[in-house]
UniProtKB/Swiss-Prot annotation:
Catalytic reactions of this protein: acetyl-CoA + H2O = acetate + CoA + H(+); butanoyl-CoA + H2O = butanoate + CoA + H(+); hexanoyl-CoA + H2O = hexanoate + CoA + H(+)
UniProt protein name: Acetyl-coenzyme A thioesterase
Residues with the N6-succinyllysine modification: K34, K97, K160, K229
Primary location recorded for the protein, binned into one broad class: cytoplasm
The species this protein was found in: Rattus norvegicus
A GO term, aspect molecular function: identical protein binding
Binding site for CoA: T54, A55, S56, S83, T84, S85, R145, K235, F236, R237
One GO term (biological process): acyl-CoA metabolic process
Gene3D superfamilies, per the entry: 3.30.530.20, Hotdog Thioesterase
């Protein structure tokens, strides 16, 4: 691995020993969390010049695993300093010492606060930005901070919206499981080796203990080998010190096909509090697991059947947190996108156009779409796959299907109703049913505006179908190279499916398999802290219905 350490960066390298591994020979997630927290703390103190403590940790997604004998390298640095707190970027890679091949294990962001002596006031110095990537992370740090600050309000709002989904007292159904047997309690006495150099219990050690009890809880449900896939955003509510007794309570909250969420609550007791039974709530965290059987195949978890009101609260909370995680994927774990697209070849226009249409139909037919929002005329669904997030917006429109098709297939009209579109022009009329457009979109997250080159393929219904199709995907056109004024971006698969309800109304479904460049426009809505999708959908409905009332219906 590259040994060079950038200014302000801290590098930790560890050879994975048997003591660091679980029963399957893989690096314990708890051990990795300890190393990550230590490295991040040292990076924070390198910038601040005084002691710092962990305040919170953003979502952590483990993209791979590491095994005994491999080398783990952890790099941490401050991305942005605020008045008395800092965001720390943590990147973990693993290398096989025999082949030299290295892989990314995870990217995480944590927040540290300074711990001055006495009443000393501290104002942190700004971070010196030297590369373009550092400037990007610096801008995104502000967005991530907004997400952290509004997290509790966002969660509360989603919980209020979801109260109608299910009665809190339910009877058992076939193929479901209750969570009573997954409850786990454990206690730890904080000793000097568990404390950091400030005298407080080491934050990474608390994370490791939480991971241990959560793993036991998950194993009681799956009867297999659970492994930690991600950790939800959490913050430390208060400190603990040497001599404290820490009590950990874990229980399964909900399952989502191949994953399970386990909640862990941590309370701290000093000697007096222990005798009185009055502890301090210092942390709550939510850990998401996958599991494999003896053949290393992913296990499908049984659906959870909430019985009590407390079961129901935890069940609904897990659904809300999952939705928020989907929206946070861009701002928490931003990956620099390398724009891709199909190379446009006029001699293969028929094949490329058909691929465009079939991709949209395949996306719509996938199973696993989950509803996130229901309004009077609008329903929003999301589909989470291994490496992709897709959104579907269904709109009930009081206009004939052919009118909606005529309006939505003409992308030059899209800026009239879509607030994200600035301009849209035809640059190649390929055929009567296929056009290539150049599109410019609005600025998001303070970055440069984005532009796209897309193929739009439209299809009227066949005899055995009644669906109008408008599909689009990015293409690479040498005559329209990237411009330094814009960020050339990608549409993987998107479009409209329009079906008549009767002679005067239709259902319009908009689908988009989101690339990293598209996700910023949708992240807030998916995560629950924005209403941009609902607003665009309402604008689309109004645009189509107004056009009908203005006489377009008679023209057609």
């Amino acid at each position: 691995m590259e040994p060079t350490v950038a200014p302000g960066e801290v590098l930790m390298s560890q050879a994975i020993q048997p003591a660091h591994a679980d029963s399957r020979g893989e690096l314990s997630a708890g051990q990795l969390l300890k190393w990550m927290d230590t490295t991040a703390c040292l990076a924070a103190e390198k910038h601040a010049g005084i002691s710092c403590v962990t305040a919170s940790m953003d979502d952590i997604l483990f993209e791979d695993t590491a095994r005994i004998g491999q080398i783990v390298t952890i790099r941490a640095k401050v991305t942005r300093a605020f008045s008395t707190s800092m965001e720390i970027s943590i990147k973990v890679r693993v290398q096989d010492k025999f082949t030299g091949i290295q892989k990314l294990l995870c990217v995480a962001f944590s927040t540290f606060v300074v711990k001055p002596l006495g009443k000393e006031k501290v104002h942190l110095k700004p971070v010196l930005l030297q590369t373009e990537q550092e400037q990007v992370e610096h801008r995104l740090a502000s967005e991530r901070r907004k997400v952290r600050l509004q997290h509790e309000n966002t969660f509360s709002n989603i919980m209020k919206e979801s109260n109608w989904l299910r009665d809190p007292v339910c009877n058992e159904e076939e193929g479901t499981a209750t969570t009573m047997a997954t409850s786990v309690q454990s206690i730890e006495l904080v000793l000097p080796p568990h404390a950091n150099h400030h005298g407080n219990t080491f934050g990474g050690q608390i994370m490791a203990w939480m991971e241990t009890v959560a793993t036991i809880s998950a194993s009681r449900l799956c009867h297999g080998h659970p492994f930690l896939k991600s950790v939800d955003m959490f913050k430390f509510r208060g400190p603990s010190t040497v001599g404290d007794r820490l009590v950990f309570n874990a229980i399964v909250n909900n399952t989502f096909q191949n994953s399970v969420e386990v909640g862990v609550r941590v309370e701290a007791f000093d000697c007096r509090e222990w005798a009185e039974g009055q502890g301090r709530h210092i942390n709550s965290a939510f850990l998401i697991y996958n599991a494999v059987d003896d053949q290393e195949e992913l296990i499908t978890f049984p659906r959870i059947q909430p019985i009590s009101k407390d079961d129901f609260r935890r069940y609904q909370g897990a659904i809300a947190r999952r939705r928020i995680r989907l929206g946070r994927k861009y701002v928490i774990s931003h990956k620099k996108e390398v724009p891709l697209g199909t190379q446009w070849d006029i001699s293969k226009k028929g094949s490329i156009s058909n691929t465009n249409v079939e991709a949209l139909k395949n996306l719509a037919s996938k199973s696993g779409w989950e509803i996130t929002t229901t309004l009077e005329k609008i329903k929003i669904y999301t589909l989470e796959e291994q490496d992709a997030i897709s959104v579907k917006v269904e709109k009930q429109v009081g206009s004939p299907a052919r009118v909606a098709y005529h309006l939505l297939s003409d992308f030059t009209k899209r800026p009239l109703w879509d607030p994200h579109y600035i301009s849209c022009e035809v640059i190649d009329q390929v055929s009567e049913d296929d056009q290539i457009y150049y599109i410019t979109c609005s600025v998001v997250n303070g970055d440069k505006p984005k532009d796209f080159v897309v193929l739009v393929s439209q299809r009227k219904p066949l005899k055995d179908d009644n669906t109008y199709i408008v599909a689009l995907m990015s293409v690479v056109l040498p005559s329209v190279p990237p411009s330094p004024q814009y960020i050339r971006s990608q549409v993987i698969c998107a479009g409209f499916l329009i079906q008549p309800v009767d002679s005067s109304s239709c259902t319009v479904a908009y689908l988009n398999q989101m690339s990293d460049s598209i996700l910023p426009y949708f992240a807030g809505n998916i995560g629950g802290w924005s209403k941009s999708i609902e607003e665009a959908a309402a604008s689309c409905i109004k645009f189509i219905e107004n056009a009908t009332h203005d006489g377009l219906k008679s023209v057609l």
